């Protein structure tokens, strides 16, 4: 009778124990799959090129980031360059596509969103753990044909759900609510084409959907350079 009782308890407990993988365990495995905390933390600055495609229109871009401090994005479309910069708690932009040729301060909501991007792409969960953002394990589900773990992260700029591949523990996707120009919208990103880069494994393609955009946007990352010397003057707002 005792053996039967132990067997019964084991069978009942098995689904609970299988499901009870914690957010901390998932994040630790994600960080390990990315290359490890030491490798991620060692990146203080980085630059990369972007190829951007939306609705048959192709653009190119270059980004420079000083982790947790500054970011500059330059995007060229139809022969014109759009620039967006955040430096500390301030930001500015030049957008000739909207008739602007002189720098303008970034609105507060755009500033807040851009500040959330001042880290190495694909390392969001490392950042969430390091900054002690509230994290909740929602459960295991499907993202397309992949089994994924759903982690809800409350970031300063909004709530984001990260979908972690249950096999590779790499970030497969992210859904977030973002408020821009007074409008709250749902952003969806799919991460793919992970590649090894100096001991790190990072996504090099991102498919982004946002109801405010005319269609899906695809970003392809290339020419990543870690820890280049960055001149602080590139973040200064032109006079």
Write out the residue ranges for each language-model feature.
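A short, sequence-level motif marking secondary-structure junctions
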Residues: 63-70, 87-90, 110, 165-168, ...
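Gly/Pro-enriched, hydrophobic low-complexity segments
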Residues: 144-237
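Structural motif
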Residues: 54, 77, 143-144, 197
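A residue-level signal for beta-strand positions that form part of recognition/binding surfaces
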Residues: 45, 132-134, 218
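Flexible, processing/modification-adjacent segments and terminal tails
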Residues: 19-32, 39, 93-158, 179-185, ...
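Bacterial Sec-dependent N-terminal signal peptides
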Residues: 1-23
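N-terminal mature ectodomain segment of secretory-pathway/periplasmic proteins
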Residues: 24-99, 137
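Residue-level detector of beta-strand face positions
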Residues: 47-51, 74, 92, 140, ...
């Amino acid at each position: 009778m005792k053996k039967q009782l132990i067997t019964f308890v084991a069978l009942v407990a098995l689904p609970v124990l299988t499901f009870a993988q914690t957010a901390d365990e998932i994040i630790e495995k994600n960080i390990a799959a990315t290359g490890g905390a030491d490798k991620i933390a060692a990146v203080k600055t980085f630059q990369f090129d972007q190829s951007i495609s939306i609705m048959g229109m192709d653009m190119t871009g270059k980004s420079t980031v000083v982790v947790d401090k500054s970011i500059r994005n330059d995007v060229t479309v139809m022969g014109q360059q759009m620039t967006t910069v955040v430096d500390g708690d301030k930001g500015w932009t030049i957008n000739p596509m909207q008739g602007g040729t002189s720098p303008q301060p970034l609105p507060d909501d755009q500033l807040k969103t851009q500040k959330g991007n001042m880290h190495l792409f694909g390392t969001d969960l490392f950042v969430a753990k390091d900054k002690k953002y509230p994290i909740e394990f929602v459960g295991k589900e499907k993202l397309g044909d992949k089994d994924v773990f759903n982690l809800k992260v409350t970031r300063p700029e909004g709530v984001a759900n990260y979908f972690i591949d249950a096999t590779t523990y790499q970030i497969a996707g992210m859904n977030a609510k973002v408020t821009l120009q007074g409008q709250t919208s749902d952003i969806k990103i799919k991460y793919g084409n992970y590649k090894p880069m100096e001991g790190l494994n990072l996504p090099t393609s991102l498919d982004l959907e946002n109801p405010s955009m005319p269609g899906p946007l695809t970003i392809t990352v290339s020419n990543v350079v870690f820890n280049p010397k960055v001149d602080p003057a590139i973040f200064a707002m032109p006079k």
